[in-house]
Swiss-Prot record:
It catalyses: a 2'-deoxyadenosine in DNA + S-adenosyl-L-methionine = an N(6)-methyl-2'-deoxyadenosine in DNA + S-adenosyl-L-homocysteine + H(+). This seems to be a weaker methylase than M1.MboI. The MboI restriction system has two different methylases. The keyword Coiled coil does not apply. Its EC number is 2.1.1.72. The lineage of its organism: Bacteria, Pseudomonadati, Pseudomonadota, Gammaproteobacteria, Moraxellales. It comes from Moraxella bovis. This is Type II methyltransferase M2.MboI.
Amino acid sequence: MRIKPYFESDDKNFNIYQGNCIDFMSHFQDNSIDMIFADPPYFLSNDGLTFKNSIIQSVNKGEWDKNDNEASIYNFNHEWIAQARQLLKDNGTIWISGTHHNIFTVGQVLKENNFKILNIITWEKPNPPPNFSCRYFTYSSEWIIWARKHSKIPHYFNYDLMKKLNGDKQQKDIWRLPAVGSWEKTQGKHPTQKPLGLLSRIILSSTQKDDLILDPFSGSGTTGIAGVLLDRNYIGIEQELEFLELSKRRYHEITPVLKNEFKQKIRKQISAI
């Protein structure tokens, strides 16, 4: 039985579903997804404080980001990653972003589920939040693990394009990309929103036109918006109504004129599209 999306574009290339990704992924067809990008909860919401935009703010993102039980976090990651593997095509790949709070558990779970880790990308942010406590080095990066489903089945990688985007030099595993720009938040924002430049580079490097991309933690829909700009097909899963509505607004924002404007801005971030 086909599950009805919360929102489906007229061309059926942009679909978002409301619900828990673990529940929903079991309803999708196995071996049908070309690439998965996932930005799972980092579980950072511990009532601490941070310094952002010259204002002291709470680090709390929402109830979905609260969990201080290591066993529970491990089981959560194991369950959704195992289901994600079922959905990937045999030559498919998965990208998972995180910080030191969750990325080591994610890497371990990937290996336990027989993924082959290809790279660990360091996303360096040129303008990180100030070091509020002054008790350790300033956090200025996040990591993104890239892995493929099978150790011996080749994956797709657009090496030539990545080299072209890097001034005809091999693209390294340290990416210096800016955080989300104000032009990406005109319809609203998500507390852990990723920049379109980051997702565009990921999509361009590991997928081809008309490929099917899944984001099980869709948030504000950045993966899907980047997919629309780059002529890919998208499935997103998100629990929170406010972010589903935000994703819809962002999708409807992309008129032909604005699509070209967005691509020009992304081009400045990653050199060329």
